[in-house]
């Protein structure tokens, strides 16, 4: 059975929506033809998505273990075929990483603010620039990934670690002031890793934040309007 990796974000006993929950409110029309093709091929989308999520979890875990110098990520609960595929993808990551000068700062860092929560995959110094990274095992780099990264950047500047003391909070804030760019690093099943980098000061990053902000407003509005159900 594949482990449920959804994390709950709590502030003063109040559950906060996650960044991915908020972005899920946005329609993704590009998924409709894909789902149709998968259905015509007889693929069970529930099983496919569970496998995709499981593979991503293992790869994330192995990258975290690598940067934190753990002995090994425990993937024993996952199917053998998935473990073998994750080894292949992790090998691709190592090849990608070997071509860059990367120093790890934080990994898998759960953050919260008064509006939402989210877990930052990695904050590193990459080729001399402090970079906020999100690892993806998806087939493509989708635009909303940068909305996700803009939310994580907001959390670094205005939020705090969900766990830890004031010293850690101070460290994260100080590093947040030095972040120069965000990057999506795609490690696909087929093909080699691809990275897309956007500077914090760019128009593209501004648009990414506007996209997330609009998604957050829509998420909150949907919660409110759902209360207007017809009386029984």
What are these regions (language model features)?
Residues 1, 231-232:
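Short, Lys/Arg-enriched, disordered terminal segments
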Residues 1-117:
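Metal-dependent nuclease catalytic cores that hydrolyze phosphodiester bonds in DNA/RNA
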Residues 85, 109-230:
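Nucleic-acid nuclease catalytic cores
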């Amino acid at each position: 059975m594949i482990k449920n990796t959804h994390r709950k974000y709590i502030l003063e006993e109040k559950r906060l929506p996650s960044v991915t929950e908020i972005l899920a409110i946005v329609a993704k029309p590009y998924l409709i033809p894909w789902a149709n093709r998968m259905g015509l091929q007889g693929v069970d989308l529930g099983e496919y998505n569970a496998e995709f999520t499981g593979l991503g979890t293992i790869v994330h875990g192995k990258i975290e273990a690598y940067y934190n110098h753990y002995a090994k990520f425990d993937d024993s609960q996952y199917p053998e075929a998935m473990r073998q595929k994750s080894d292949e993808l992790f090998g691709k990551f190592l090849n990608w990483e070997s071509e860059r000068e990367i120093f790890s700062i934080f990994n898998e860092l759960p953050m919260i603010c008064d509006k939402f929560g989210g877990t930052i995959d990695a904050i590193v110094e990459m080729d001399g620039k402090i970079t906020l990274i999100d690892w993806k095992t998806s087939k493509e780099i989708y635009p909303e990934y940068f909305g996700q990264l803009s939310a994580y950047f907001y959390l670094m500047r205005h939020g705090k670690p969900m766990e830890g003391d004031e010293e850690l909070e101070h460290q994260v804030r100080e590093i947040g002031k030095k972040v120069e760019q965000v990057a999506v690093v795609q490690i696909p099943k087929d093909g080699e890793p691809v990275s897309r980098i956007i500077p914090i000061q760019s128009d593209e990053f501004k648009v990414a934040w506007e996209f997330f902000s609009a998604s957050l407003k829509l998420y909150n509005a949907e919660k409110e309007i759902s209360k207007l159900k017809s009386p029984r």
